[in-house]
UniProtKB/Swiss-Prot annotation:
Similarity-based family: Belongs to the thiolase-like superfamily. FabH family.
Location of the active site: 113, 249, 279
Metabolic or biological pathway, per its Swiss-Prot or TrEMBL entry: Lipid metabolism; fatty acid biosynthesis
Annotated spans, ACP-binding: 250-254
EC number annotated for this UniProt entry: 2.3.1.180
Lineage, top ranks: Bacteria, Pseudomonadati, Pseudomonadota, Gammaproteobacteria, Cardiobacteriales
Function: Catalyzes the condensation reaction of fatty acid synthesis by the addition to an acyl acceptor of two carbons from malonyl-ACP. Catalyzes the first condensation reaction which initiates fatty acid synthesis and may therefore play a role in governing the total rate of fatty acid production. Possesses both acetoacetyl-ACP synthase and acetyl transacylase activities. Its substrate specificity determines the biosynthesis of branched-chain and/or straight-chain of fatty acids.
Organism for this UniProt entry: Dichelobacter nodosus (strain VCS1703A)
Subunit structure and binding partners: Homodimer.
Gene of this entry: fabH
A Gene Ontology BP annotation from the UniProt entry: fatty acid biosynthetic process
CDD domains: KAS_III
Name this protein carries in UniProt: Beta-ketoacyl-[acyl-carrier-protein] synthase III
The keyword Calcium is assigned to this record: no
């Protein structure tokens, strides 16, 4: 049986770091208020001249270097993002050009914070079908551009960054199983209402920023993700004690804790970066994975459970052997 296996990871975070204390100087909040509710201490924010494709490119370069593979060996590039700098062309095509991946196909996917899981599954299917051998999968976001910095309920939650993996055909076990879900009936609980195709034409009434009903999102996320991880274990015919590390979407420490407790996983078996990165949306999971790999926490042969939840609602996850 042919598998798809992650052979390299990479990450990129903008150099500007904004602490909770710095945010408290421009809005009614505090480090204690933010940290106690989210687990976030700081976030990285893109500079004015830094774009989504810039960050995707830097993360991709590092993933290629760590995979010890040349750019011209890549068959396909998939970028998961909700914050591209262009309506078209896709961010993936911009990255393809900058990497000089001359023969690679390229496209974007959009599933909000679950985007990387959707992109990874798409890459996995392409490889298992035999169509492609090496796929570059990237999650990249500049959510600072769609956050209302006067709204403390959302502004404190998000950061910018990019994470990437090289997924390659392998006879060794890699991705063992994936489950994806969506429920569009709850779209208004977490969304950016204004889009280019919106029927709203009055600029004064446009709503171009993230709007969220936090309490409802939290309840739905915990319920959905705890059920999801149980589904994944059944699909892969595994028990929770066979999971070496949980790599969750880094949105909120309380959601992360709820999923870990459902799996009876000690916190030492959970990769947590939300305190340093905040919620980087589609970049969240690959950034956390890269953090674990680069710091020697995750090793070859470890069984990993990845999961994410985002606007839509969308949610999904996979179990893989690293």
């Amino acid at each position: 049986m042919m598998y798809s296996k992650i052979i390299g990871t990479g990450g990129y975070l903008p150099s500007r770091i904004v602490s909770n204390d710095e945010l408290s100087q421009s809005m009614q909040t505090s480090d204690e208020w933010i940290y106690s509710r989210t687990g976030i201490r700081q976030r990285h924010l893109a500079s004015p001249d830094e774009s989504c494709s810039d960050m995707a490119f830097y993360a991709a370069k590092r993933a290629l270097e760590n995979a010890h593979i040349e750019a011209d060996a890549i068959d396909l590039i998939i970028v998961a993002t909700s914050t591209p700098e262009h309506i078209f062309p896709s961010t993936a095509t911009v990255v393809q050009s900058r990497l000089s991946c001359q023969r690679a196909a390229a496209f974007d996917v959009q599933a909000a914070c679950t985007g990387f899981m959707y992109a990874l599954n798409t890459a996995d299917c392409f490889i298992k079908s035999g169509q492609y051998q090496n796929v570059l999968v990237i999650g990249a976001e500049v959510f600072s551009r769609i956050v209302d910095w006067q709204d403390r309920n959302t502004a404190v939650l998000f950061g910018d960054g990019a994470g990437a993996v090289v997924l390659s055909a392998s006879e060794e076990a890699g991705i063992l199983g994936t489950i994806l879900h969506a429920d569009g009936s709850h779209k208004e609980l977490l969304w950016v209402p204004q889009g280019i195709g919106s029927s709203e034409t009055d600029f004064a009434t446009r709503r171009p920023f993230i709007e969220m009903q936090g309490r409802e999102v939290f309840k739905f996320a915990v319920r959905s993700l705890t059920h999801l991880v149980s589904e994944l274990l059944v699909q892969c015919q595994m028990s929770a004690d066979e999971i070496d590390f949980l790599i969750p979407h880094q949105a909120n420490s309380r959601i992360i804790q709820a999923v870990a407790e459902h799996l009876n996983l000690p916190i030492e078996k959970v990769i947590i970066t939300v305190n340093q990165h905040a919620n980087t949306s589609a970049a969240s999971v690959p950034l956390a994975l890269d953090y674990g790999v680069q710091n020697g926490i995750i090793k070859r042969g470890d069984n990993l459970l990845l999961e994410a939840f985002g606007g839509g609602f969308t949610w999904g996850g996979c179990i893989l052997t690293y």
